[in-house]
């Protein structure tokens, strides 16, 4: 099992991730992103700019219920990769199976969102001192 340990800022829980195309499992081309960990989200999401830079094909708009209400947003297939503690930039990330996720609208604090589709494959813990731990693999 691999793990990531970090501290959150007291307002939101974010961590670095890598976003990859889902159409070819041998294509390890990625974009770095900062992901919000959201236990209230059913599915994961990526910023529209990431989808465009990776050349992801839209799967159409679908309804999305969020804290801001009901809206319609583009859907994409993508993969999320996590770099375990102790790995260097030359290491390969742990890559989860493809997600059927949604397009985020611009946030200045994060460019991806990790929802329960990914978190249910992990052990996630947070303590009173703002330390977070994510175990996966």
Question: Language-model segments: what does each one mean?
Answer:
Residues 1-137:
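Pepsin/retropepsin-fold aspartyl endopeptidases
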